[in-house]
C-alpha cells in the first residue's frame, strides 16, 4: 500500500537535481566527493510556490539541534492543525511526535492514526503509546522516555490488508488542506541518519485525494488494541513483568 506523486515544475525538479548531484559527486570517476548523510551539510528546506499550491522540500538527515530537522518540521505542521489530523504511516517510532499528538488531542483536534500491522505491535511503536500500552523489548527494557497515554486514544488502529501486503504510506493530512509525505518514516533514524525526502504540500485539491485514501483504509480497520498486540503484550508480561526503562549509556 503506497502512493506516487508526479510534480511537473522546473523549480521543484531543480531542487531534486541539486540533491542528486550532492550524492552523485563525479559519479564513477573515482574521486571521493559524493556526499551522503550528514556530509551533505544539513540543507535547509526549500519552498516553491506553485500557483494555487506550495511545496516545501526537505532532504534529511540533520543533527538533533538543527531547527528544521524532519521530526521538528512535522511537529510544526501538526501544531498548525485547528480541526483535524489524519495519519497513515509504515513506521511511527518518534516519541516527540507522539507527545505532540497527545497535546493536540487535549486541545480538541480530531486525530486519526493508522500504522502498518506488522510494525504497530513492536516495542518501539508509538502506536502503543497512543493506546496507553507499554511493551518491553526482548531484553525486558522499555524505550527511553516512554510515555504511554494515560487515557487511550480511540482513533488509532491498523488497516486490514491482503496477506503479504504492507501499509507503506508515510503521509498525514492537516485540516484537509496540507499533505505531509515523502520517503520519510516517522522515526529518529529518518530524521538524523538516513538520506530521505520530506514534502509539505499546501494544496486542498491534493489533500482531498489523500483524505479519500485515509477514509478507504479507515473503513474496516481494526481500532484499539488488536489481537496481535494483545498476544505480544501478554507474552512479554509473562516473560518480563512491567519491564524497566532503558538508561543512557555512560560516555567514554
Where are the regions a protein language model picked out?
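PLD-like (HKD) phosphodiesterase/transphosphatidyltransferase domain
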Residues: 43-119, 251-252
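PLD/PLD-like phosphodiesterase catalytic module centered on the HKD motif
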Residues: 1-40, 84, 94-252
